[in-house]
Amino acid sequence: MACWWPLLLELWTVMPTWAGDELLNICMNAKHHKRVPSPEDKLYEECIPWKDNACCTLTTSWEAHLDVSPLYNFSLFHCGLLMPGCRKHFIQAICFYECSPNLGPWIQPVGSLGWEVAPSGQGERVVNVPLCQEDCEEWWEDCRMSYTCKSNWRGGWDWSQGKNRCPKGAQCLPFSHYFPTPADLCEKTWSNSFKASPERRNSGRCLQKWFEPAQGNPNVAVARLFASSAPSWELSYTIMVCSLFLPFLS
């Protein structure tokens, strides 16, 4: 029996590393994502930061920039044109969602979150991705004078004409009415896909929805940090059971 204990101790040591690696450099199972990330030399505009390693294709990056995106037949202009800076933030957020291979620690099956049918062929989504404080603040500041009619854009639209329209009785009002704070905008727009982090950029503890390509992807290290704190409970349980039965094998 004694010869087994060093092996078990070694497994306990490497287990968090194994679990963490499973959450790194992956694409979610969703309608437009590639199966695995890979270089995409010709990504479009706001999606360019992910060209070295992307979960999106050139086509997806192009469609993310259209006023009525074919990705989900969703129009950002349901209450008229957005201010240019506001529109840019939303396109960056779409590129981040579609292209980033660094969202593994926050990926969850859609069915586990209360939806009986996965929307738009989507099997997975992200939940509570911690966006840096500046990302939420700048997004809110640049959008607060644009107009919308809902705080949760993930559902509840009128799709009778093939694209999203404001539901009956919903008023088009400034973003600041539906999103009183930067955290409200980050967290409510897509039903808690993002979370407003109190951490700032370069802290190593929050993700940036956009970054300068020449400076490298700061989200790689952040994803590794969060992945290392999310061990695989399935593997942990297996090792625990084995350790309990070892005395009977002597």
Curated annotation (Swiss-Prot):
The lineage of its organism: Eukaryota, Metazoa, Chordata, Craniata, Vertebrata. Residues 62-81 are annotated as: Important for interaction with IZUMO1. This is Sperm-egg fusion protein Juno. It comes from Homo sapiens (Human). It is a lipid-anchor; GPI-anchor. It comes from the Eukaryota. The gene is IZUMO1R. A lipid is attached at residue 228 (GPI-anchor amidated serine). The keyword Secreted does not apply. GO terms for cellular component: external side of plasma membrane; extracellular region; microvillus membrane; plasma membrane.
